[in-house]
Structures are given as structure tokens and as C-alpha cells.
């Protein structure tokens, strides 16, 4: 484990580098305008520090790259699939495993098997693609995160927790037969990368059992959640990360995972089912026409091998300590400068409170997105909005959803940037904050009907 000295440095050596392109302010003003003021539509070559997402952006280890050379590209029965199954079974304790090309592929396969039209999926706080797949399957996603998550200024160790009283009351009101399943997202991205405590998971399991409802996990950042439990929850300080993960998932019936986060790979996802063989059979039947045969699920053998090795590597406590503390390093710099963030910082990103940063910009004009545009113009930094733009419209009313939390997410890729990059990011945010009164909101030029933030085009409100 780290001592105070070694905590200051990354616990790895850099073997390969990629040059970063430096653009001028004038070029960035032109480029973002050409992209319709949508940072998703920028070319990556025109981005200096890319904090858009931690999904698929990790730097793989030499051990993972070595595994890539052992890819068994057989259509059926790949040895890399067998290795992946063994690793998942060992870490999570789930019997049945199928790979998918990424997390949303897992949701697209699994959710229609679990959701009947009009049923509710109760989560701590669903992310955008998850909520979209719930709605595409005919369901309704309901967020049940604790009220403390909405208070960005004050400390709470587990802001990703379910409000268990609200959860049970909702089930009583709507009837258990109208609940498709409960989905625990660990860590809770939309709340600020915030962890869920073991005690809360246990209580959600108790409620699920009481009403005969299944509990699934969105396990994209499972190891980061386990690290927070070890650091913050009494009784777990002396347990290994692997032991904590095993206990967490013992309370679930299955999980979907974007392996592009904590499995430290650039592509891949998983569906794992604890012991329901009948559901596993249905998953396989759905998987084949959509993702590919059961033993590859849209992935090359080499990618499954890298995923298996990444799942093992992410359990290293030294890595996790550095990872979480790099996020904290950036968050502390911003907080010390008076910039409003979700406090404490979460596992994969620093979340700036856009409504407090730009109180003069109405939420319908996407204040957090406006900050993202200004960060790119200021320093070539690409962040992402997790707020009203991402939330989309209510399918019943057609009105913009206006979430209580409206964030700029500074998402830190794993094993990619040093704290020198974080210093640049902090300075850029401070400069934007200093001229915040001059920043205007945005409106649509083109608005797609689904997941609009990916391909929308916008313009400043004059």
C-alpha cells in the first residue's frame, strides 16, 4: 500500500507516448463552431486534453498487450472466452457469462427480456444510455438516489446510495408486479461518480427479496466502488478489494457491464447471471442475432483476453489508490479556487455544478454545456455535460427534463494523464470561472429524437 511519498506519483512507468496537438484559440473558436458547438462532433486530433469520457480511453498494460498476442479468433469455443468466464466467475461469483461489444449492447440484449411495457426500473440514478434502453424496451426508469446527492457542497461518504424508504414506498404504491427489476449503478455516474455503501446494497436486497423483485448491477465501475467501501465503511478497512467485490455482487441476481471502464480495455462489455439458467438461455438466444455467437459476443478473441486480464489488474489496491486520488487532486484544486463541485469527488471524474457556476443561464439553455464549450475554447480541453442536454425530453410530454443535478463532467481516463495535465485543467477552469458572467446559453439548431447530446447541433443564445 502507498505511503505518503509514493502516493504522489503514478504507480506505473510510461512505455509508449502519443503526441498531443496544440491548437490556437482562434482555431478552437472556428473548430467548435464548425462542430455545431457539440464537443462529440470534434475530431480527436483537435483536442489537447480529452476528458469527454473514461469509457474505452484507458491505457492498457504490457500484460494486457501481451495477452492480445494470444488471441484465439475461433468463431466458436475461443479459449479467450473460457479464460474470461473463469475470471468473471472467480471475481464476482456468477455462474453464467456472455460477452458483448460494450455496455449498451449488454443492456440491449438483457433489458427486453426483463421489462414488460409500462413496467418500472428503479435505480439509484440511471445514466443516459441505460435510461434510453429502458425506454426502448417499453419501461420507465425511476431514480431513487438519496437527497444528499443533490447537495453538492456538503460531504456524504456514499452519495450514490438508494433512498430505501422511497424505494419501498414506490413499490407499495405501484405494486411489485409493475416493477421489472431494481438496478444499482456502482459507482453512480449521474450523481457524480458517487459510491454505494455495502449496507445500502444489503438493504436494497432485503427490499427486493421482500417483494420478489430481482436486483441487477450496472457494474461498469465496480472496483472503484469497492475501494470507496474499503476507505469509508466501517468493517471493511481490512478486507481486500476482491473480497469486497465478491460480497457486493453476492446480493445481486446479475449484472451488465461496460468493460471499457474498470476492465481497463478499449472495447467490450459483459452480461453475467448469478444462477438463473433459464434467463441465461434466453440471453443466449437474444445475443446471437444481435451481438454474435455466445463465445465472442461481438468481440475479437484478443479483446476478450485483454478484458480478462484487465479485470484482474483493476483489483490492485495501489492502482485504485492512485486512480481515486488523481480525481481528488483535481477536485481539491477546483474547490480551493471556490469553484462549485460535487463534494466529495467520486471515482472517475470531477463534476462541476453547472447551475451554481452559471446561475444567470436558465437550465433550458444548458449552462453546463456552455461551460464545456468555453473550456474547449480556453485550453482545448474536451469535457462533457451531464445535465439537461443529456437528460433529453420526457417521452410523454415532449418537455425538456430538467434534472436537479446539472454537471460538467471532467472525466479522467485511466493511466493516461499525469497530474501536470490536471494542473492545466484546473487553471483553465479557473480562467473560465473568472469570466463566467459573460458566458451565454445554447439552443438547438438540430435536435435528434433519441440520445440527442451525441449528434445535436447548437448555437449560442444571443
From Swiss-Prot:
Keywords recorded for this protein, A-Z: Lyase, Pyridoxal phosphate, Tryptophan catabolism
CDD domains noted in UniProt: Tnase_like
Catalytic activity field: L-tryptophan + H2O = indole + pyruvate + NH4(+)
Modification sites for N6-(pyridoxal phosphate)lysine: 261
Annotated metabolic or biological route of this protein: Amino-acid degradation; L-tryptophan degradation via pyruvate pathway; indole and pyruvate from L-tryptophan: step 1/1
EC number: 4.1.99.1
Pfam families reported for this sequence: Beta_elim_lyase
Signal peptide, first to last residue: none
EC supergroup of this enzyme: lyase
Cofactor(s) in the UniProt record: pyridoxal 5'-phosphate
Single Gene Ontology MF annotation: tryptophanase activity
PROSITE patterns named in the record: BETA_ELIM_LYASE
Family designation: Belongs to the beta-eliminating lyase family.
Alphabetized NCBIfam families for the sequence: PRK13238.1 (NF009709)
Quaternary context: Homotetramer.
Protein name from the UniProt record: Tryptophanase
Lineage: Bacteria, Bacillati, Bacillota, Clostridia, Thermoanaerobacterales
